[in-house]
From Swiss-Prot:
It comes from Pseudomonas fluorescens (strain ATCC BAA-477 / NRRL B-23932 / Pf-5). Belongs to the polysaccharide lyase 5 family. It is an enzyme of class 4 (lyase). The gene is algL. This is Alginate lyase. Catalyzes the depolymerization of alginate by cleaving the beta-1,4 glycosidic bond between two adjacent sugar residues via a beta-elimination mechanism. May serve to degrade mislocalized alginate that is trapped in the periplasmic space. Keywords: Lyase, Periplasm, Signal. GO terms for cellular component: periplasmic space. Its EC number is 4.2.2.3. Substrate binds at residues 67-68, 140-141, 258. SUPFAM superfamilies: Chondroitin AC/alginate lyase. It is found in: Periplasm.
Length: 371
């Protein structure tokens, strides 16, 4: 048989194989990184749990909040103490459910007390029932709170949903109600943040994409997954050849802090994409790696940022270990230098409610130091 004849025979079958393989991958349920499958550490009994705090009232009002940078110029870098306090007061219940969900899930995954799980699900179910955080009446700070809250709650929930201990098996009705609410909120977050002009696309868009990625996996929605990946690529392509983000450089004395703040959502999205067969590490010539290295170098020598934008950098935020929680997913994607790993181990465990709790437990359990 001539090779051309053989090719004619093979091409349709190879095409068929490619189509089958592609559709099988597309049909595979979305999943989180392996650490989310961890079982509950131990199931304790007795009444040593801390009880269930009073539930924060479901927030169903307009998402119109004052910005902590109110009155600041375009750089949005000068804190307004009065408006920050007003913001904290009006968003207190939202922050309480974010922090409370993260805390209770961590406690339950450690102690396995049914009361901890019941408390978490009761809070989330009540907010879902009330259709909280879904107002179409919002300003920029309001839509920012919506995506932060969704990311916090959905990413903590993932540990319950995927744990090999299957804690949600006997709570299916509540789980469905909560997931339907997350799903609806993610649709609104996409609407809030989709297709912004590039000069308006910054860390907020990356955090929005993270909340949508966490929800995509919690609800197995490929359309949400694809949107989060799309937004990641926009962000990665904003990183310049030297690892700077031009829109974050505009933040003057807080430029380095905001570069660091842009990293957690990007690293988490790349990590989640990776386990679902989408490798984002190479996007824009390893943009994520370049950004991480630029920030770590900047922490060591902030002058690199001062030379870039002419402003001495405010290092306050960069003295907080949890602000470097992005190192967990980042060092699972790239081979981190020994010096970086040493820094990571000194700062562990990384607990941050906006990423769903204890990331060290998820990504580097060998270095988990307990709670």
């Amino acid at each position: 048989m001539q090779s051309t004849d053989l090719k004619r025979l093979l091409i349709p079958s190879l095409l068929g194989l490619a189509i089958v393989t592609g559709s099988a991958q597309a049909a595979a349920p979305l999943r989180p990184p392996q650490g989310y499958y961890a079982p509950v550490d131990k199931f304790k009994s007795g009444d040593n749990s801390e009880g269930c705090d009073a539930m924060p009232a479901p927030y169903t009002g307009a998402l119109q909040f004052r910005s902590k940078y109110e009155g600041s110029d375009k750089a949005r870098a000068t804190l307004n103490v009065q408006s920050e306090q007003a913001f904290r007061d009006t968003t207190a219940d939202i922050t309480k459910i974010e922090r409370g969900t993260s805390k209770r899930v961590m406690q339950f995954m450690r102690d396995g007390r049914p009361e901890q799980l019941d408390c978490t699900l009761a809070w989330l179910s009540a907010w879902a029932q009330a259709d909280a955080l879904m107002s179409k009446d919002f300003n920029h700070t309001g839509k920012s709170m919506r995506k932060w809250a969704l990311g916090s709650m959905a990413s903590a929930y993932l540990r319950l949903k995927f744990s090999d201990s299957h804690p949600l098996a006997t709570h299916q009705e509540q789980a469905q109600k909560i997931e339907a609410w997350f799903s609806k909120m993610a649709d609104q977050v996409v609407s809030d943040w989709d297709n912004l002009p590039l000069d308006k696309t910054n860390n907020h868009s990356y955090w929005a994409a993270w909340s949508v990625m966490a929800t995509a996996v919690a609800t197995n929605r490929r359309d949400l997954f694809d949107w989060a990946v799309k937004e990641y690529k926009v962000g990665a392509n904003q990183v310049d050849a030297d690892g700077f983000l031009p829109n974050e450089l505009k933040r003057q004395q807080r430029a380095l802090a905001y570069h660091n703040y842009a990293l957690p959502p990007l690293a988490m999205i790349a990590s989640f994409a990776q386990v679902n067969g989408v490798d984002l590490r190479q996007e824009n010539h390893e943009a994520l790696k370049r950004l991480g290295e630029r920030v770590l170098a900047g922490v060591k020598d902030p002058d690199t940022f001062e030379k870039k934008n002419g402003k001495q950098q405010d290092m306050t935020d960069l003295k907080v270990d949890s602000k470097f929680a992005w190192l967990e997913p980042y060092c699972s994607l790239y081979t981190c230098a020994p010096e970086t790993l040493e820094r990571k181990h000194k700062m562990q465990p990384f607990k941050t409610f906006r990423l769903g709790g204890d990331l060290t437990k998820v990504y580097d359990p060998a270095h988990e130091k307990g709670s």
